[in-house]
């Protein structure tokens, strides 16, 4: 009996040691942009540009990490002067995300309970030329368009991984709901 217990403990230890290394998930918050999210790995910040026919050219702030060949990305765009056009801007961004891709899921998204509820959209697409699979979530809140994208790259290939869903569903706009000890996301300089 003792040998079986020792053998089981050794086997369990070896299984843990041979498992692929994955970064720990952390809670991040941006007080200035008004959201919190959970992501694995080291988050990098950059700026980018976006152009839509309705929205026009926009500067974007992008928070990105990659872990286990899954790319996690939050993109924030300001539309403070165009809040009356929020439905059109949101719809345009959703359309551009899924355009010319095979749509696997398209459903409404909701975060925050009760009177704090914010509605948006969740879409999963298969990328062209076996480029992987991306799940996106889109929310327009207080004059900002928030886009979350989790792309399972072909090198990972585990399209049933729960990690993209964990990331997409972790966003919160009521900052008191962020985990205690969340790391402040740095804005680009």
State what each model feature region is.
Residues 1-10:
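Bacterial N-terminal signal peptides that target proteins for export
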Residues 61-91, 147-149:
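A short acidic-to-branched-hydrophobic micro-motif
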Residues 31, 43, 88-104, 144-189:
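Surface-exposed amphipathic alpha-helical segments
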Residues 38-62, 94-141:
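Signature of long, low-cysteine stretches enriched in small and polar/charged residues
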Residues 31, 38-40, 46, 64-66, ...:
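A structural detector for beta-sheet-dominated domains
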Residues 24-32, 50-53, 180-183:
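Short acidic/polar N-terminal linker immediately downstream of export determinants
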Residues 48-50, 83-88, 114, 158-162:
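A short, polar/proline- and glycine-enriched secondary-structure boundary/capping micro-motif
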Residues 18-23:
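Sec/Tat signal peptide C-region and signal peptidase I cleavage site
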């Amino acid at each position: 009996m003792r040998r079986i217990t020792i053998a089981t403990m050794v086997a369990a230890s070896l299984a843990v040691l041979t498992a692929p290394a994955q970064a720990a998930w952390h809670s991040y918050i941006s007080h200035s942009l008004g959201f919190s999210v959970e992501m694995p790995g080291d988050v990098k910040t950059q700026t980018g540009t976006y152009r839509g026919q309705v929205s026009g050219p926009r500067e974007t702030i992008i928070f990105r990490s990659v872990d286990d060949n899954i790319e996690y990305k939050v993109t924030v765009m300001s539309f403070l002067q165009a809040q009356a056009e929020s439905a059109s801007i949101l719809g345009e961004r959703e359309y551009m995300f899924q355009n010319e891709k095979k749509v696997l899921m398209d459903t409404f998204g909701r975060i925050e309970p009760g009177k704090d509820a914010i509605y948006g959209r969740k879409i999963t697409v298969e990328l062209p030329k076996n480029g992987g699979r991306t799940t996106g979530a889109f929310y327009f809140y207080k004059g900002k368009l928030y886009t979350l994208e989790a792309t399972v790259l072909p090198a990972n290939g585990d399209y049933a991984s729960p990690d993209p869903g964990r990331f997409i569903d972790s966003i919160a706009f009521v900052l008191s709901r962020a985990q205690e000890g969340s790391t402040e996301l740095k804005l680009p300089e």
